[in-house]
Amino acid sequence: MEIENNQAQQPKAEKLWWELELEMQENQNDIQVRVKIDDPKQYLVNVTAACLLQEGSYYQDKDERRYIITKALLEVAESDPEFICQLAVYIRNELYIRTTTNYIVAFCVVHKNTQPFIEKYFNKAVLLPNDLLEVCEFAQVLYIFDATEFKNLYLDRILSQDIRKELTFRKCLQRCVRSKFSEFNEYQLGKYCTESQRKKTMFRYLSVTNKQKWDQTKKKRKENLLTKLQAIKESEDKSKRETGDIMNVEDAIKALKPAVMKKIAKRQNAMKKHMKAPKIPNSTLESKYLTFKDLIKFCHISEPKERVYKILGKKYPKTEEEYKAAFGDSASAPFNPELAGKRMKIEISKTWENELSAKGNTAEVWDNLISSNQLPYMAMLRNLSNILKAGVSDTTHSIVINKICEPKAVENSKMFPLQFFSAIEAVNEAVTKGFKAKKRENMNLKGQIEAVKEVVEKTDEEKKDMELEQTEEGEFVKVNEGIGKQYINSIELAIKIAVNKNLDEIKGHTAIFSDVSGSMSTSMSGGAKKYGSVRTCLECALVLGLMVKQRCEKSSFYIFSSPSSQCNKCYLEVDLPGDELRPSMQKLLQEKGKLGGGTDFPYECIDEWTKNKTHVDNIVILSDMMIAEGYSDINVRGSSIVNSIKKYKDEVNPNIKIFAVDLEGYGKCLNLGDEFNENNYIKIFGMSDSILKFISAKQGGANMVEVIKNFALQKIGQK
């Protein structure tokens, strides 16, 4: 495949599919890096694992990742179709890759060779209601590919079509959907398939297929919103005049602190801006276009009846006899005569997001959420800063601190160690820098109205007290240092638990090389949601390296860049202070300043090992791979790297293994010659802490194909 200026083009037909050739332009020199893997299944594992960094869009006309994965799937489907189903189960449950899993599952549903196997794996690969919808949407695309026997993998001919008019649900897909739908409970459906979400889906789809009708609908929705706001204002005015209090809603809002008013105004302006220029999909495929109503209709779903009735919006039975006849013993509650004849609907699930949106970021809200165990582990860790700012009770602090390092909660959290590190940074910032105290945070329209009512109903004396309280808002305060230290210690312990639970001990002596050159300051793909406050390749490399170090029987940690006035070598071995993450990070960043900003691989270090007969079992390289062949100074350097490693292999340790992690995921890696194959030179493209599992498995001699097969069989209870 050729890539020019980061734009994907159609791969050359004459190349074998497993020969991935990336051609880029760098300093007017052509760079060619070839990765060749003879086993189609191993290649498929590698290209799907690369999605850890950034998943493909799958809906663009010429999406390169979709092309590569589809070609790899077609090859494996001819030799071992069941393995594709097993891979989907593995990458969804172990690597937490969602969209690519759904694409692979859809492929299995469509392709004739995988259809006999997918039904027994489907329910373990599809976990959420949204996953089920996405699988069905991908299936519509793959049915189009299947019609041409997968010879045309581009979508230009259908991007502007109204795909809802040509929906296809074949028997295999229908059976899988019916089976999975029965596993969802009403709480899950309440999060993902409410009537309001269905309307939003159809509204966005309308923006692509019928622009004129969409404009009319948008205008009508805006008018309805303004009418509701006016009705609320008039109702409040009337109510207060009847009680002799002429203070209306506008007066009540003015009584609130100006800072709060500013926040409310900012939110309202953002809403207006969104209404003027909402995000519009570029094609029908980029817009979600299926709902659970569609699945019920096309897949003939009839059970569980009560949930089906609610999604379809059928009327509640008028009598108890009709109720029993309709739902029988499967009814979730006894007959309620007050609901007779009314339209049934899936209730919106009570979640922590809804509570915060309605009531604001206050201590009382957080206390209630945490004490009632309504705050999931991941949400709790991501919101530590908000919890600290809200000023929760000591009891709540104690609950949170204990829960952070609870082994079972950590194991089930599926959290990136980078996100744990971000939590430490958030707590440390709150302790050292502090924040401005706030009594009220952003809340939704309903919450704002309730806040206004609260002000209106106060007596004059209470209003004066409130104004006095508000003058104290905005003071610069810091979190108690003792509390902050407890939080940090708890998170550090959680990191150790997470690494120990998910990673076997790496035997022998492991040398970890972390690139700290200037190019490593580039931002990582994935954003705050995936990596938290750890945003650059440098931070990712250091944190990941420290994770590896924790599980090594014996280790050496090196940073490398280029020589400087302070150091005549391009690398430094750093003696780290124990296993604590923050002190180790600080030490590494401090030592980084002694090196230059260029990128040289420390082959001299390997020469030194050879000279001193230092036994090293594993080398782990964490870099953006600017050291790969083709970059500046590489003709000399590249040759030296190969010669140094080959000499060490011949004279000291013939079984040494090298793990090269390309954090940017571009497929660039050092070319070490034919002596190094996929068994002793493992190239990993992309960034994830699941890389740790790969290193552990490969270091122990495990075959990833067999690991995946065994995992999937255990999941479905056949092993």
Curated annotation (Swiss-Prot):
GO BP annotations listed: telomere maintenance via recombination
Nucleotidyltransferase as UniProt keyword: yes
Subunit and partners: Telomerase consist of two subunit, p80 and p95 that form a 1:1:1 complex with the 159 nt telomerase RNA.
A cellular component annotation (GO) from this entry: chromosome, telomeric region
Protein name: Telomerase component p80
Enzyme class: transferase
Enzyme Commission code: 2.7.7.49
Catalytic activity, as annotated: DNA(n) + a 2'-deoxyribonucleoside 5'-triphosphate = DNA(n+1) + diphosphate
UniProt-annotated location(s): Nucleus; Chromosome, Telomere
GO MF annotations in UniProt: DNA binding; telomerase activity; telomerase RNA binding
Keywords: Chromosome, DNA-binding, Nucleotidyltransferase, Nucleus, RNA-directed DNA polymerase, Telomere, Transferase
Keyword Nucleus tagged: yes
Alphabetized Pfam families for the sequence: TROVE
Domain TROVE: 24-508
Function: Ribonucleoprotein DNA polymerase that catalyzes the de novo synthesis of telomeric simple sequence repeats. Subunit p80 binds tightly and specifically to the telomerase RNA suggesting its association with a region of RNA secondary structure.
Organism for this UniProt entry: Tetrahymena thermophila
